[in-house]
Amino acid sequence: WSYVDDLILPDDLDAALKRMLDAWRPTLDKHARLWIWRQLADREASAYLTSLLRRHRIGVHRVDEILRSQDEEWTRLSLGRKRYVLWSSVRGAASQFLSSGGNEDAALEVLSREMRRRTRWLVVKAAAGELRRTDYCFLPDTGWRRPLMIDVALESVLKIGDDYWLAAPSLGDI
């Protein structure tokens, strides 16, 4: 046996990863890139909802179930609008939580119902052309530290810029 001297790793990991991801991107078709966009956005929405519920001391054990149970219209919202819907709906859920003496089931029922109502309202307004791209979009604060995975995806695989936050994931935008 012997040591393999041919395997020399580059000193600049950043540059090496960028080269690898840039080489990988052309092998992905639009459907694969759309899948990545949806997965990242869905996880961001889930993390945002989790943080909002924790802030109000409401249990987070049903977050994924609540998000999966939303109507088809939910998928037509941008991530920024989903964040608005979540923020607005959690306010109603928190109010119910307090007025019901801490009944989480009642609060989460209000949350789910409010999400559907606000989603429908936004979809109707958007279809009527009554919304600008940034209306009812909650973008992260400037001090928010974006997860590395999102940075990597946006810089190398997706290359969609602000559409990540302002457009609903679609093949036309990839």
Where are the model-predicted features located?
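Basic, alpha-helical nucleic-acid-binding regions used in initiation and control of genome expression
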Residues: 1-174
